[in-house]
Amino acid sequence: MFRQVQKRCWGGAAIIVTDPPFNIGYHYNSYKDKLNEKDYLNLIYNVTEKMNVPYVLIHYPEDLYKIAIHNQKTPTRVCSWVYNSNTAKQHRDIAYFDIKPNFKQVLQPYKNPNDKRIKQRIAEGKLGCKLYDWWNINQIKNVSKEKTEHPCQMPLDVMKNVIGVLPKETIIVDPFMGSGTTGIACKELGYDFIGCEIDEKYFNIAKERLFEEI
């Protein structure tokens, strides 16, 4: 499958962006989320470092350390996505490997828009400040309109931040497409996208969501 992706991307600038299964026993529809650690690290290696292109991984911090050591690669930049949760884990990290994100490409609202200096900037057409590396974005709740049947769905705003700092002339490749949020972010931001998903149910969810964006 990934050889086909490589052929499709040949001659283009590809970057892998993915939120892989976390290997902590999530109840996915048709695949096991509890491999032994060696097999899991090898799986991540095969779809990142072995592809010989820059990549961006979203994971829990302690697992990103293990992946970086296994891949023998140090991230060029790490951001944190923080969210309210009733579980022990309340943030995930986004690690950029072999690519330097440009945070000036994503503008976020000013925190103090009533400040005199900020009002002047807005009047000058400066409608936001560059993205920080600490993102407070809520997880998707079961009652959210955005929610699908995928048990580990990423918020669209997170993925738009992750992708929006990458070079514009880029093919984004997600080897663990899930519900298709990476593809939707690419569509809204103007990036080309290739996604892979082995579960037919989740693939169809992603396909339907992407068709709605066309």
What is the predicted function of each stretch?
Residues A206-K207:
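Conserved SAM-binding loop
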